[in-house]
Amino acid sequence: MASAFRSSLKLRASARLPAVRTITTTPRLRAAEKPYFPNEPTAPKLATAIPGPKNKAASEQLNEVFDVRSLNMLADYTKSVGNYIADLDGNMLLDVYAQIASIPVGYNNPHLLKVAASPEMATSLINRPALGNFPSADWAHILKTGILKVAPKGLDQVFTAMAGSDANETAYKAAFMYYRQQQRGGPEKEFTEEEIQSSMLNQTPGSPQLSIMSFKAGFHGRLFGSLSTTRSKPIHKLDIPAFDWPQAPFPSLKYPLEEHAKENAEEEQRCLQEAERLIKEWHNPVAAIIVEPIQSEGGDNHASPAFFRGLREITKRNNVLFIVDEVQTGVGATGKFWAHDHWNLETPPDMVTFSKKAQTAGYYFGNPALRPNKPYRQFNTWMGDPSRALIFRGIIEEIERLFLVENTAATGDYLYSGLERLAKQYPEHLQNLRGKGQGTFIAWDTPKRDEFLVKGKGVGINIGGSGQNAVRLRPMLIFQKHHADILLESIEKIIKQL
């Protein structure tokens, strides 16, 4: 195992610099732009090869007790600040991956440090409650001033959870219970003795053969139910039993969009027709569909607002619940607080799941009938974590104080324009640019994607990929135009090295 690990380190060493030296890019702080973090570096700083000697030694040590084969880098979070992530060797990288889209307001955000040091936080941490049985007296206040303060339009209730997979899993349970409740004739109808007994044998009618429909290339998590709806990569699913649930096609759009409007509209219509056919004909009745506003792990695949409005109409027409997975797209990343706000739906989704940038998790809903008809049906010991809910409240306060959703929309437009220029200059390396008008939630395809990502560290950028060929940008909400200038300059440097 040790030799295999050393081999993987050698592969990652391709990010090394020609010599061990400090390198900085040219900072271009825009005159009218005040940085949110005055103490963050003005540009990336590279002090050693990547990985450096301290990082390699620490990785070897960690490998003795923890599987590090997915390791990207070991970070020093005591020195990371704002948009910059530090490693153990003194390197400071501009982070446009942000813990897989999970850090919203910067490393070591001063306001969040105050929240973390508050007596309220200390009480939540050392007296963690079983929320379903023993919530704190201020739990309603915490929810109303935090998670529910930013609830999607029309959804005024929440079930809190631990992670994105958990949020989706519990949303599926809510959909199934609602479906059967409607079949019985309402929440007041009692279970039959046959249902009770057969459920303990995992047989019908107590364990009904129902399904959740998801989309090709979608990602919804890695638990049993959520993994059955995940369709992005085989490595996530191999050897794991899965439910017999339908998969609908997701539109495969051609770019630039303005040059392929007719073809793309036809493609979206084809996918909508197939989705409705599957709902009507699948042998296990479909209780709900789940869809990402942008397929994030599956390759940053987009569809138009008209497509999603069409999906909503299909679900209403067929009495199927509509679940929107905002785990990666939510909390401001697309230039609106929730990505589905771009769609202008006539009626809201039935449930919206969230996590990542929220630093907590759960699903929003509005219909009281989505509460199970009896207690303990949607339940676990923790049912979320008050300490994480407090952090999300602090994040919301920062977003509102600094107008970070608006910043992300404006910075995204600026960044996209710069990428359009690079795409014209280097069309073989920057293909199918997408995400216009979607904040900083931008991606493109490149034939040498993996090499591109590795070389990113060599110019001081921590950047990620998705799908087979996509480079995805997931900067924080505090990412500004002067950061975009650094990123654009760095992307051009990488391209010239390919």
Curated annotation (Swiss-Prot):
Q: Known catalysed reaction(s)?
A: 4-aminobutanoate + 2-oxoglutarate = succinate semialdehyde + L-glutamate
Main localization (coarse): cytoplasm
Needed cofactors? pyridoxal 5'-phosphate
Mark the residues carrying the PTM N6-(pyridoxal phosphate)lysine: K356
Write down the superkingdom of origin.
Answer: Eukaryota
Q: Name one Pfam family in it.
A: Aminotran_3
UniProt xrefs under CDD domains: OAT_like
Q: Does the keyword Ribonucleoprotein apply?
A: no
Q: Which GO terms describe its molecular function?
A: 4-aminobutyrate:2-oxoglutarate transaminase activity; pyridoxal phosphate binding
Statement: the UniProt record of this protein carries the keyword Cytoplasm: yes
Q: What are its GO cellular component terms?
A: cytosol; mitochondrion
**Chain residues that bind substrate:** R222
Q: What is its EC number?
A: 2.6.1.19
Q: What does this protein do?
A: Deaminates gamma-aminobutyric acid (GABA) to succinate-semialdehyde, which in turn is converted to succinate by the succinate semialdehyde dehydrogenase. Required for the degradation of GABA, which is important for utilization of GABA as nitrogen source.
* Record family assignment: Belongs to the class-III pyridoxal-phosphate-dependent aminotransferase family.
Complexes and interactors: Homodimer.
Q: What is this protein called?
A: 4-aminobutyrate aminotransferase
> What organism is this sequence from?
Emericella nidulans (strain FGSC A4 / ATCC 38163 / CBS 112.46 / NRRL 194 / M139) (Aspergillus nidulans)
